[in-house]
A protein has these predicted regions:
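Exposed loop and linker-edge segments at protein-protein interfaces
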Residues: 49-50, 55, 67, 157, ...
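Elongated periplasmic alpha-helical coiled-coil
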Residues: 32, 40, 131-163, 180-181
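Short, solvent-exposed beta-edge and connector elements
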Residues: 25-26, 30-52, 58-62, 147-152, ...
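N-terminal signal peptide c-region/cleavage motif recognized by signal peptidases
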Residues: 16-17
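Bacterial N-terminal signal peptides that target proteins for export
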Residues: 2-9
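Amphipathic alpha-helical coiled-coil/rod segments that serve as protein-protein coupling scaffolds
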Residues: 22, 49, 54-147
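Short, conserved beta-turn/loop elements at beta-strand boundaries and strand-helix junctions
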Residues: 158, 218-224
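Short, well-ordered beta-strand segments in soluble/periplasmic domains
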Residues: 172-220, 230-241, 251-252
Length: 255
């Protein structure tokens, strides 16, 4: 089945031309990984820390929502956990006293089992309170949107002071492209596609620079560009510390 090739993010298709030389193919550079991230919780945007074109590192805060309501929920959950912890300790002490009486023969088996049941309930209530606290803390953490990996900021739809609804049909996002790793896309005929198996070492040439690359995958179906060129899409990954813009032409020297 033939299909139109599109950029990694679904942008408009750009032509890639196969050349006659058997040892080199022309292609273009794409982002190795391009993702849209959002906060995961809803709230008013308190701060935006990045702008398009900026380089960010993994864990860097991109956007902050107003945390007040989430902080209140954490304090409530922490108080509830402390209360259930105290009740659990008291129930544990009661059970130990009842166990001592049972060992002396002063308490029936039925009464001891009732104490065991009360202790089990106290333990379960405390466990649930701990989970509620962890959940509240997790939601508080989500008010600070962080970069999942080293990246370039492509664009952001967050607006300072606006309400960001995470469950909206089109929620506010920051679009990131992985920094340091790139993909070269090219078309190959069937014979060459059979040669370029995953792991094959190649050389990628971009603007006079050479990079060691590796074939990441080869398409199983032919692809047709908007210019009518047909072939099998080959993806090659390579590393570069410098920015290489998506859509930049490249050449790939084959083994």
């Amino acid at each position: 089945m033939k299909k139109s090739i599109r950029t990694l993010a679904g942008a408009a298709a750009l032509a890639m031309t196969m050349v006659a030389a058997a040892d080199s193919l022309q292609g273009k550079i794409e982002w190795s990984r391009r993702v849209a991230v959002n906060t995961g919780v809803s709230g008013q945007v308190r701060a935006i820390h990045v702008t398009p074109g900026e380089a960010v590192v993994a864990g860097q805060v991109l956007v902050e929502l107003d945390p007040v309501l989430f902080q209140i929920r954490v304090r409530q959950a922490r108080s509830q956990e402390a209360l259930y912890a105290a009740e659990m300790d008291a129930q544990q002490a009661d059970f130990e006293r009842e166990q001592a009486l049972f060992d002396e023969g002063s308490l029936s088996t039925v009464q001891l089992k009732l104490e065991q049941l009360s202790l089990s309930r106290a333990l379960a209530a405390h466990t649930f309170a701990v989970l509620e606290l962890e959940h509240a803390q997790h939601r508080l953490d989500l008010t600070r949107l962080k970069a999942p990996f080293d990246a370039w900021v492509i664009e952001s739809s967050f607006e300072l002071g606006a309400y960001a609804a995470s469950d909206a049909e089109a929620p506010a996002t920051v679009i990131l492209a992985e920094r340091g790793v790139y993909a070269a896309h090219l078309l190959a005929d069937r014979a060459l596609a059979n040669r370029l198996v995953a792991g094959t070492a190649v050389t990628v040439r971009v603007s006079g620079q050479r990079f060691a690359g590796t074939v990441a995958g080869t398409g199983l179906e032919p692809t047709t560009t908007v210019d009518g060129v047909t072939g099998y899409l080959v993806t090659i990954r390579f590393e570069s510390r410098a920015l290489i813009r998506a859509g930049t032409p490249c050449a790939v020297d084959l083994p």
